[in-house]
C-alpha cells in the first residue's frame, strides 16, 4: 500500500518511542513510503533545530528515509485545497503517488478527511486500519 507520512509523524518517530515509531516501522517493512526532497529537508531541519537531535543521528535517519522511500514530484494542488499552504506539498505527494493514506497529526489536513482518493488519517487511525485494534491482537505492544 502506498503511504505518505507527514513530517510531524516522521519527527515524532525519532523524538520518542511509541505509536509514530510503530507506524514508521510498519511502513518501512510492509508498505511503500512516499517522500520528496522538501519533506526530508523539513524533517532534518526540525530534528536539528527544535528537537536538538545530534547531527549524526539525524543524518542516519534521513539516509534511511531516502533509501526506503520512493521520491515523487508533487502534483499541482489548488491553493484553496486546504487551510495551510504549507500542507499543499503533502497533498501533491499523495495525489502524484496515488497514496491510499496520508498519515498526519496536522488538524489542517485531518479536517479534510480525504483528498481525491487519499484518506487523511491520524497515526492511531492508520495503525488501527493496518493492524486492527488491541482487542484483535494487533494493537501496539
Residue ranges of model-derived segments:
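Short active-site oxyanion
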Residues: 30-33, 98-100, 118
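Residues that scaffold the ATP/ADP-binding catalytic core of kinase and kinase-like folds
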Residues: 12-14, 46, 112, 129-130
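Acidic, PIN/NYN-like endoribonuclease modules and their adjacent C-terminal/linker elements
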Residues: 81, 88, 107-141
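A secondary-structure boundary/capping signal
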Residues: 6-7, 35-36, 105-106, 122-123
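Short, well-structured N-terminal submotif of metal-dependent ribonuclease cores
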Residues: 1-35
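PIN-domain endoribonuclease scaffold, especially VapC-family toxins
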Residues: 26-78
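Active-site neighborhoods of divalent-metal-dependent phosphate/nucleic-acid chemistry enzymes
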Residues: 67-102, 107, 111
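Amphipathic coiled-coil/heptad-repeat helices and related helical stalk/stem segments
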Residues: 19-20, 58, 86-87
